[in-house]
């Protein structure tokens, strides 16, 4: 195309050309007519959307390396687009039809400073990645920020103020600011959905294509608030993980005791813990006395105690564990009986024998854990 442009037009059509690796099929094979593994982009667009196709081709794209295309990647990109769309719908629902963006207020909460600092850093890093043609790295950062940081954390935390009304105007302004920056940074990869959302939220240019590219702003760098939010988020993650391990449903709330040297930080985050860590109440102190039978969770910045009685019906849980233990012991005895039989070990395929050995090892570990849980329950 370059030679043709020079020959017929007398000028170079492109000054910068990025040469990428081959797009291979899901098995890593080169696409060819003989293999019949070619992909019709128009069919992919019909199925997942043009934005999802563009995003998929950029994801994991490293200079000099080939990439594999699969339906799973297309579905993941479509799901990502849906996640962004639903986040935008949520923001618009609270903005209403007559909302006018007032700019960022001066009185910002810790979570506002945290997300603004995060998106500020994101703008700098994505810009640097694009200038170095590191498209795959830029896309990965955008994906992680939008899905995890913005949707799963900030929006969930912002709901507290939006639903209570107190501080709602500040939350709305920050949501618009961050969403706008996200759309601009994502636009090179997903131009259609970003333009559609941009037109729906307060905007200052006719099209997102001619809007100002986000730039790093030193006044929006809040390192202290970022560190404080990480302490709170680490605690919330730890509580959620422990509850998941114990199969505690979100509907079952519990009091949380936080023993920490950072009382001021966790006092600010107590409402976040109530919403995201399913706490009925949060008590914070430098140290606690005997709290009785509790689940203990340790993070880098706090020791967290949850009364076991708030989480578990001891009698019902004991019956459940005993039933599960009996079933596991019965299954292990059956497998061990097969493995003790020379006829089975010598005649069965090695793969089948190994599967039984692996299953026996897993059951042995499970039985030990169940017995330990029963012992702890009785303490």
Regions found by a protein language model. Name each.
Residues 46, 61, 65:
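Gly/Pro-rich active-site capping loops and adjacent beta-alpha segments
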């Amino acid at each position: 195309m370059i030679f043709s442009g020079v020959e017929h037009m007398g000028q170079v059509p492109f000054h910068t050309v990025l040469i990428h690796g081959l797009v291979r099929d899901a098995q890593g094979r080169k696409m060819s007519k003989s293999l019949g593994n070619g992909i019709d982009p128009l069919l992919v667009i019909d199925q997942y959307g043009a934005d999802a196709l563009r995003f998929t081709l950029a994801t994991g794209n490293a200079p000099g390396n080939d990439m594999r295309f699969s339906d799973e990647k297309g579905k993941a990109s479509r799901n990502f687009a849906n996640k962004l769309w639903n986040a935008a719908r949520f923001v618009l629902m609270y903005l209403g039809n007559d909302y006018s963006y007032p700019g960022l207020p001066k009185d910002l909460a810790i979570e506002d400073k945290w997300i603004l600092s995060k998106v500020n850093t994101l703008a700098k890093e994505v810009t640097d990645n694009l200038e170095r043609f590191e498209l795959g790295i830029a896309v990965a950062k955008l994906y992680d920020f939008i899905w995890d940081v913005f949707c799963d954390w900030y929006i969930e935390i912002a709901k507290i103020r939006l639903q209570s009304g107190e501080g709602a105007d500040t939350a709305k302004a920050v949501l618009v600011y961050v969403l706008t920056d996200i759309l601009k940074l994502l636009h090179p990869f997903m131009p259609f959905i970003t333009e559609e959302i941009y037109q729906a939220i307060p905007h200052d240019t006719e099209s997102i294509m001619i809007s100002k590219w986000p730039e790093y702003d030193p006044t929006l760098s809040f390192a202290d608030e970022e560190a404080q939010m990480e302490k709170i988020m680490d605690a919330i993650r730890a509580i959620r993980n422990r509850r998941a391990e114990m199969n505690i449903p979100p509907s079952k709330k519990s009091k949380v005791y936080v023993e920490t040297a950072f009382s001021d930080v966790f006092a600010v985050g107590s409402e976040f813990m109530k919403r995201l860590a399913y706490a009925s109440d949060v008590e914070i102190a430098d140290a606690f006395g005997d709290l009785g039978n509790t689940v203990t969770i340790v993070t880098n910045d706090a020791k967290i105690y949850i009364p076991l009685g708030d989480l578990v019906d001891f009698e019902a849980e004991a019956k459940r564990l005993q039933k599960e233990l009996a079933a596991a012991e019965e299954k292990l005895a059956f497998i061990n009986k097969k493995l003790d039989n020379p006829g089975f070990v010598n005649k069965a395929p090695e793969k089948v024998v190994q599967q039984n050995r692996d299953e026996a090892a897993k059951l042995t570990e499970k039985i030990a854990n169940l017995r330990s849980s029963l012992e702890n329950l009785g303490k």
